[in-house]
Every structure is written in structure tokens, then in C-alpha cells.
Curated annotation (Swiss-Prot):
Entry's family note: Belongs to the TRAFAC class TrmE-Era-EngA-EngB-Septin-like GTPase superfamily. EngA (Der) GTPase family.
Any Pfam family: KH_dom-like
Complexes and interactors: Associates with the 50S ribosomal subunit.
Protein name (Swiss-Prot/TrEMBL): GTPase Der
HAMAP family the UniProt entry points to: GTPase_Der (MF_00195)
Phylogenetic placement of the source organism: Bacteria, Pseudomonadati, Chlorobiota, Chlorobiia, Chlorobiales
Species annotation: Chlorobium limicola (strain DSM 245 / NBRC 103803 / 6330)
Binding residues annotated for GTP 1, in chain numbering: 9-16, 56-60, 120-123
All residue ranges annotated as the KH-like domain in the record: 354-437
Listed InterPro entries: AAA+_ATPase (IPR003593), G_ENGA (IPR031166), GTP-bd (IPR006073), GTPase_Der (IPR016484), KH_dom-like (IPR032859), KH_dom-like_a/b (IPR015946), P-loop_NTPase (IPR027417), Small_GTP-bd (IPR005225)
GO term, biological process aspect, one: ribosome biogenesis
Length: 437
């Protein structure tokens, strides 16, 4: 296992900026608004040939609102999980009550944990002098640094990695995990869904929309298959996106879909399918990802034996050409159909990478052409000679014909429907390409 380093501190001291500086990428959301990183976020890093995991946490503060209490609990969990801790403060705002509370907590409760005390935003000689007063926290060897320009960070990393055990190297060149992006509008139950699967309070969960702003990876194994769940902030309507945090969160949703094999799109059963849900689904379809639609909070719906059929028919009437997407009714609260959802997602992943022999495809083509003959266009007849599958990350089929311009949309839809039925391609977009031969 790679050693785990946790970044802790009160809100807005620059933890996410330091996180990005160490990893040399814009992974955690960075904003001047206090408390922007509200959950734990773990990413792999490397320094001087040594590998580690870096965890960015929500800010620890003494406020008594529900979100602050959850952030405190998450920070404590992060400290317990970590091999060592970077305790970050801000020289520009000076030592605060929350800084001193964190200092006491670390020295009393976690005295056996390696703590690296850092003072951030030390970017001038005067600020260096000001930073000297931070020894009153009880940490006698503070690191003066600037996460923004990188000064002092290398020295701290040298000492941290020197103190940690070597990571165990494993051969993970061939990643066989199934990557699932858990996406949807705010407050549809994405984090509750992930927590129910993992059996742990891994994410902050409350009824306040947007309590998960960053995308966070969690791994678990089911039936000897490893899964990576990428939980994201909900994608909001543009009118609700603030300049700053919500923009980055929406971008994170898009990036999560880019990384995944299957986009698991959650709906709130009470709200039904909205334009924003279709936007997320279309985003996944355009990127040629598998898609699974989960109608969450089904336990809150009054129903009889026909309710799910009526509900699904209504959904599909609004989905247009996306009828190939499987729909499941779940409850993250009662765990109804949770594992069925994972099994279906795994099946979709297999469908997406399915390879079909050319001989099987041409037998299919022969049967399809005998059932429906392509209509003529401008007096010209479409003649398809053969077909094959093109090597790609999703199913792409090439049809070699006399003139691609003669292919009409209804015939294209017919072939796509029959391909799905014949070769088990539910849940994945497929591409048909007609080429002149």
C-alpha cells in the first residue's frame, strides 16, 4: 500500500492549493470561499521516485451547523486513516481559535501520529517574521511555504517522504477495474448510494443540495470484480451555477464521465426526468460511455404492481433515441436493488467492450437484409456487401456498400435495433459507419 498523507486545517488556509501544487494538477476545487473542499479527496502522487496518496479534507471549524459538523467528522476520520498529517495554517490571517483547537486535537488525541506543521502564504520577508509567532501552537519546527508559488514545499516533501515507509509496488499496468461515474443533479442521493454500497460514511450526506462538490474515488470488490465509484457534485442548471465553485463542480462531472466506462445516472423518483438529467445522459452518450439510469428514492413513491411500468414508459417517452438505456428502480436508504444496479453496470461495461466476429456479423447482415430490404432513393438501390467491427472503446460497425448517401435514417435505426437484440448491446451507444466499396 502507498502511504497516505492527509492535509488538514481550518477552511481557506490553502489546503487545496497545496494539494494541487504537490500533485501538479488542478484536481481539488480551489476558490476563495471558505469551506470549498467539504469532503475527503484522495489522489496518487509521486515525489523523488516515491509514491504516496494525498488526501485533501474539508476545513475543520467550530461552527455548529450541520455541514461544519460533518466536515469535522470527516477531518477526524482522515487523520485516523493517514500515515502522517500536514497541518496547514495561514500567516496572513494569523493564528485563530480554530487553528489552536486543531493544534490541541492533534497533540492530545493523535500524539502518536507524525504531524508536519506548515505556515502557508509566506511570500515576503515581513511575512516570514510574522510566521515565527506560530511556534506558540506547540509545534517547534514549522515549515514556512507558499502553496501558490511553490516555495518551501519541496523541503517539506523531502522530510515527509523520508519519514514514511516505502510503498509496496504492485503490477497494475493492466487495470481490470470497472469505473463507474455516479452522476446526477444535486440531492438525488448520489453519496447515499455510494455510502450504502461501501457500508461507511465515506461522503458527507445531508438534505442540503450540493453537499458533495468534488469527485471522489472509492473502490470495492463484488464477486471478485473490482469497481471504482467516482462520486461527483450534481450538475445544476446554468442559472444556479455561481461563477467559481459550481462551474468547477460541473466541470468535474464532465471529467468524471470522461474517466468512466459506465455513467450511473441517478434521478429522484419524486422529481422525474428533467432537462438537466437528459443533458447528463447526452453528455455520456456523446462520449460513447455506457449508461445506466437509476430511479432513486423509490421507497417514497406510493405504488402498486403497475407503477414501475407506467413510470418507465413515461421516462422512455421523453428519452427519444436513448431507449437503449436500462432503467432500474432503487432506494439507497433501504438498499433496494443496489447490487442489482452494480451487476447491471458491470454487464454494460462488458457490452461496451464486446468483440463480435466478422462471420457472425455477416450472418446477421444476411438475415437482416432478408427481413427488410433497403428502400431506394432517387431510383438508386442501396447494396451492402459486407460488414465488420472496427477496433474501438465502444461498439463501432462498418458497412461496406455501393453508396453511403443512399442509407436512410429508418434503415439505420432498424439495423441498430437488430444489432442490440442479436448481440446483447444494452446500455451502450453503438456507431454505424457506411463506407463505399
Amino acid at each position: 500500500m502507498k502511504p497516505l498523507i492527509a492535509l488538514v486545517g481550518r477552511p481557506n488556509v490553502g489546503k487545496s492549493t497545496l494539494f494541487n501544487r504537490i500533485l501538479r494538477q488542478k484536481s481539488a476545487i480551489v476558490d476563495s470561499t471558505p469551506g470549498v473542499t467539504r469532503d475527503r479527496h484522495i489522489m496518487p502522487g509521486e515525489w523523488q521516485g516515491k509514491q504516496f496518496l494525498l488526501m485533501d479534507t474539508g476545513g475543520y471549524c467550530a461552527a455548529n451547523d450541520v455541514i461544519s459538523s460533518s466536515m469535522i467528522e470527516q477531518t477526524l476520520t482522515a487523520i485516523r486513516d493517514a500515515d502522517c498529517v500536514i497541518f496547514l495554517t495561514d500567516v496572513r490571517s494569523g493564528l485563530t481559535y480554530d487553528d489552536l483547537e486543531i493544534s490541541k486535537l492533534l497533540q492530545r488525541t493523535f500524539q502518536n501520529k507524525q504531524i508536519f506543521f506548515a505556515v502557508n502564504k509566506v511570500e515576503s520577508p515581513q511575512l516570514t517574521i510574522d510566521a515565527e509567532s506560530f511556534v506558540s501552537t506547540g509545534f517547534t519546527r514549522p515549515y514556512f511555504l507558499s502553496a501558490k508559488d511553490g516555495s518551501g514545499v519541496a523541503d517539506m516533501l523531502d522530510d515527509i517522504l523520508e519519514s514514511l515507509p516505502e510503498s509496496e509496488h504492485t503490477d497494475d499496468d493492466e487495470d481490470t477495474s470497472v469505473k463507474l461515474a455516479v452522476v446526477g443533479r444535486p440531492n438525488v442521493g448520489k453519496s447515499s448510494f455510494v455510502n450504502a454500497l461501501l457500508g461507511t460514511n465515506r461522503h458527507i450526506v445531508s438534505d442540503i443540495p450540493g453537499t458533495t462538490r468534488d469527485a471522489i474515488d472509492s473502490r470495492f470488490i463484488r464477486k471478485q470484480q473490482e469497481y471504482v465509484l467516482i462520486d461527483t457534485a450534481g450538475l445544476r442548471k446554468r442559472t444556479k451555477i455561481d461563477a467559481g465553485v459550481e462551474f468547477y463542480s460541473s466541470l468535474r462531472t464532465e471529467k468524471a464521465i470522461e474517466r468512466c466506462q459506465v455513467a450511473v445516472v441517478l434521478l429522484d423518483a419524486r422529481a422525474g426526468l428533467e432537462k438537466q438529467d437528459l443533458k447528463i445522459i447526452n453528455m455520456a452518450e456523446e462520449r460513447k460511455k455506457g449508461v445506466l439510469l437509476l430511479v432513486n428514492k423509490w421507497d417514497l413513491i406510493e405504488k402498486d404492481s403497475k407503477t414501475s411500468k407506467i413510470y418507465e414508459d413515461d421516462l422512455r417517452s421523453h428519452m427519444g433515441n436513448l431507449s437503449w438505456i436500462p432503467v432500474l428502480f432503487i432506494s439507497a436508504l433501504t438498499k433496494k436493488n443496489l447490487y442489482r444496479a452494480i451487476d447491471t453496470a458491470e454487464e454494460i461495461s462488458r457490452n461496451r467492450s464486446r468483440k463480435i466476429s466478422t462471420s457472425s456479423l455477416n450472418r446477421f447482415l444476411e438475415e437482416a437484409l432478408s427481413a427488410v430490404h433497403p428502400s431506394t432513393k432517387s431510383g438508386k438501390e442501396l447494396k451492402i456487401k459486407y460488414m465488420t467491427q472496427i477496433d474501438s472503446h465502444w461498439p463501432v460497425f462498418a458497412f461496406f456498400c455501393n453508396n453511403p448517401e443512399l442509407v436512410q435514417s429508418n434503415f439505420r435505426k432498424f439495423l441498430e435495433k437488430k444489432l442490440r437484440e442479436q448481440f446483447q448491446l444494452d446500455g451502450v451507444p453503438i456507431s454505424l459507419r457506411f463506407m463505399e466499396k
